[in-house]
Amino acid sequence: ERDLADVCMVGRSLLCDPDFVNKIKNGQEDDIRPCIGCLGCLSSTMLKDHVECGINPSLTSENEETVTPATISQNILVIGGGPAGLEAAYILSKRGHKVTLAERHHTLGGAMIVAGYPIAKQHFAQTTKYFIKRVIDCNIKIELNTIVDQAYLSQHHYDHIIVATGAKPLRLDIFK
């Protein structure tokens, strides 16, 4: 009411998204990169000489405002629509490349979708929505339900291919 505050504290959210406050002020809440509470920032400050963030890979290097434009725009295929594939497609697009993102399932997000199901893990779902929104906003060609095999590759030409198909879960065979 009086434009005063007793206490205002924002910590990890500013590491995830340095423009956090400006985006709230401008009504761009959907554009905020959400913190997942992994505490990578805390452990990195204790164990390393710099701060790292599990969701913001550009915290210690390039960021969205300093992405170097490519000298030559190339046609690039990113295989896999999980977090790594979404980030790769986004950065490549920002650099000026023509990007196709191929995902074998009917939706993007990869393992982050399942990670967001348990109670108190909804921040993973928010993060997945954020990554997907960025890719959609960049007009990246998205091909869902697409298997990239020899037949697919023979019908398309790409200068480079990035494989970001994720890890396989470790299954313990102790309960046979």
Residue spans for each PLM region:
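Flavin-dependent oxidoreductase catalytic cores
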Residues: 1-79, 83, 87-99, 107, ...
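Short Asp/Glu-rich motifs
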Residues: 19, 110-112, 154
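Beta1-alpha1 glycine-rich phosphate/pyrophosphate-binding loop at the start
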Residues: 78-141, 170
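Short low-complexity, flexible loop/linker segments enriched in glycine and/or proline
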Residues: 2-3, 22-26, 114-118, 157-160
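FAD-binding core/adjacent interface of flavoenzyme oxidoreductases
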Residues: 36-45, 69, 138-176
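Structural alpha-helical scaffold elements that stabilize or flank donor/cofactor-binding regions
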Residues: 1, 134, 154-155
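Short amphipathic alpha-helical segments and helix-helix/interface helices
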Residues: 21, 132, 150-153
